[in-house]
Amino acid sequence: MQKKLYHFLIIYDKIKKGKTKEKSSNNQGRKKEKMKNKVASFIITIVMLLIIIVLGLFILFVWQEIFGGDDENIQVENYVTTYNPTSEKSVEDSEKMTTPQIIKDKINQIINNSQTKTEEKETYNYAEVQVDKYFYNQLNDYSKIIYKAFEKNKEEMKTGTAQIELGDVFTDVLKTEGGDQKLEEYYQSAVETYLYDNPDVFYISASKLYLNIETTTKRKNKTYDVFINSGEKPNYFTDEFTTESQVKQTISQLEKIRSVINSQKSNNPYYDIKMVHDYLIDNIDYDTTLAKKNIYDIYGALVQKSCVCEGYAKAFKYLIDQMEIPCVMVIGQATNTNGQTENHAWNYVQIENNWYAIDCTWDDPVVIGNGKVGNDVRYRYFLRGSSTMSKDHVTSAQFTDGGETYEYPTLNVSDYR
């Protein structure tokens, strides 16, 4: 009996110890679960805080983009060209002939807060504008963009006030060191090239054209908007014109003259070139006073029939271009029969795949008294080769000091026929 009781107590004690161990194990499990829950709650809290911070920053960014912020400013810098063309036929009238030059002129530097400018900059693409002209083809890609912008806006520029938009196409240039100076050079080249390639744009004064660089700064990020206008001037017309109607009326007069001459066009380029040459020297008087302002363009040459060498050369190109005969204007220096050197302008024209020089100005000398000019003088510089022209004509590779360097067509060595 005692032996059975002893076995019972041993069994009971084992059961009791087992339950104690089980209870202790359960307590440890609950503690671990609580710890896991605390860690999970902490992680969730951190994640929520990060989400709130990111969301807040995003909302702040959107708000600044829409409504702007105090850290944005807009700065406009203007660059102006000067155009002071003078040419001469004799040393007594001699003045230096120049073409557009850039002068950095911060006449209107403006800084505004971002609330005045919120719209996005527009990109203007002039790639579709097709140009194939002699001096244009020598420009770099950036100058060609500005040239094409002029060509695209040619009709609008007859108003004298149209703004030529270039958008942000020069941002990569302006972000580089000295970028504004580079853009000035591109602009310089484009303006002078456009005026020499297109004598029909006689009503535009380069000295009244302003290149504007608008810089917008947002939190260290700069964007650039470039455009061309008349600055603070009422228009960019030459002094002869003040209204669009005056310009269009003059264009109409010029087109009538050109139409009459073109109606006499033959199938022989030689006779067509000779016809234009003869028309100019028969109808234009060389202006020895240099008092008129339009003596340097086709308006003075063909409408008022009085000009200097630059007017002769531009008028010749204007008429020959209509006949689709390749022609360029040339500037340089020439030495007259008295041995005096002067600034001068003339033309090169292509016939039968060769280039020849024509100097209408010196084929139309000023006659004192009732004397007459014989053919030996009248055609002295008509379709001449380099062997003749090099004796008294020297070309200039630059239209302006420090401007683009150009190459002229290579003249045939001998005269035509």
Question: What do the PLM-derived regions correspond to, one by one?
Answer:
Residues 6, 10-14, 19, 26:
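Short, positively charged and aromatic/hydrophobic N-terminal segments
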Residues 24-36:
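Juxtamembrane low-complexity tails/linkers enriched in Ser/Thr-Pro and polybasic
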Residues 36-267, 389-417:
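N-terminal accessory/pre-domain segments preceding catalytic cores
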Residues 183, 272, 308, 312, ...:
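Hydrophobic (often cysteine-bearing) scaffold residues that line and stabilize catalytic clefts
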Residues 242-301:
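Secondary-structure boundary elements
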Residues 287-295, 299, 306, 327-338:
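Catalytic cysteine-centered active-site loop
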Residues 311-388:
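Hydrophobic/aromatic-rich core segments of domains that either
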